[in-house]
């Protein structure tokens, strides 16, 4: 019987959304967005992250000013308990996603390992 891999992917999507980790992440994200100070700091933090990633991807040097801003914003974020909680929940979801990715990649790893034996 042929498996529709996309149906499995949609089932996985649904399953992820039903995990306690995802639900906790949603709750933490909502709490950050409901607090004006936390929301502003979190948005600024994400903007700085995107700026740094864009520079890295385009091979641009990350100047001292960008580093200073990133450090300052990171410090502000670490002082906000709502954002810290959100980041902890993100880390838990990241662990799950990494585990799933490892499982998904197993067939390719097995294929190449067999081919190299």
From Swiss-Prot:
It comes from the Bacteria. This is UPF0342 protein LMHCC_0319. SUPFAM superfamilies: YheA/YmcA-like. Belongs to the UPF0342 family. It holds the Pfam family Com_YlbF.
